[in-house]
C-alpha cells in the first residue's frame, strides 16, 4: 500500500506519519480490504486507537485521531484512486498496483511498510468441482501452476505487484 497525492498538489504530507496535515483524505470504507489495511497501519503506527476488528473504526474516529482532517469515505480502492487522481482529495491510501498507468496524475508519497499494514496478499487455490470435466480441471490447475512461475512474477511486477513475499 502507499500514500498518494495528485501531481502538483503541493501537499505538505510526506507519508502516513503526517497524513493529518492534508486538507482532505480519501479513505476506503472499513469493510473493504484497503480500508482495513489503512486502519491497521494507523493503529500500528500509534496514530489511532485500536479495536479488535479494525474494520469497525469509523471515518469520524479516523478524522478525530488525525486532528480533524476531512475524510471522504470511499466505497473501494478504485474510488479512492479516482478521487485523488482527479484532485477531489489531497491524499489517499491505495494499493501500489492501483497507481499503474496513472504515473502522470499521481505521486507516491510513501510506500507503507508491511510491519504497519500486515501482509497484503492475493491468495490463489484450485478448488474441487464435481461438475467440471477433465479439460476444465486440468486448465484450472495449469493456470494456478502458471501463477507461481517466474514468467508470471515478471508480469505481476510490471503492473506494480510486490512478488517478494513468502509462499
How does the language model describe each region?
Residues 2-167:
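Exported/periplasmic ABC-transporter solute-binding proteins
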